[in-house]
């Protein structure tokens, strides 16, 4: 199935690409008229709903027996409060979280969930990670007190972004590519550079 959101109605829908008549509402969202980006976990067991206009990330679990998604529940950030703070759950502050991807973390081998979620935090000019336990950590950017800019260097103490949006992982090259929107460049970091 292909999943999509309806902005004005605040709903998640899905359609069977081989049978467009099979188009159905999956679940309602906590807010109508707010932008939402969906990123599915590699297992297909759940997806993150990035509510970038509300500065939060929510989660909806998928039940393979019923084929239904659960009502989205809160993971991190505070509704309609934009700021910056690493931490867990409601103590985290985000500012327009944007795109993201899941990346297997070797240190989680044998755990129920072996993936960290990397995402661009547009208004905070940085890239952050969300662990399976809900801990958010700034991965890159925010050098010089979180100011925007364009600078290469060590990920946390030197690198600067200017409203990053797109982010993707290239498994072949073991590299993360970040669409640094206002700088109008695509930036690259490798896992060897991680702090």
Enumerate the predicted regions with their spans:
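Hydrophobic/aromatic beta-strand positions that recur at structurally equivalent sites within the blades
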Residues: 5, 13-18, 59-62, 129-130, ...
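Residue position within the beta-strands of beta-propeller blades
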Residues: 4-5, 48-50, 119-120, 178-180
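Blade-level signature of beta-propeller repeat domains, shared across WD40, Kelch, NHL, RCC1
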Residues: 163-195
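Residue-level detector of Asp-centered blade-edge/turn motifs that repeat once per structural unit
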Residues: 40-44, 102-114, 169-173
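A short loop-to-beta-strand structural motif that recurs across blades of beta-propeller domains
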Residues: 10-13, 55-58, 125-129, 135, ...
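Gly/Pro-rich loop segments of beta-rich domains
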Residues: 18-36, 67-99, 134-165, 195
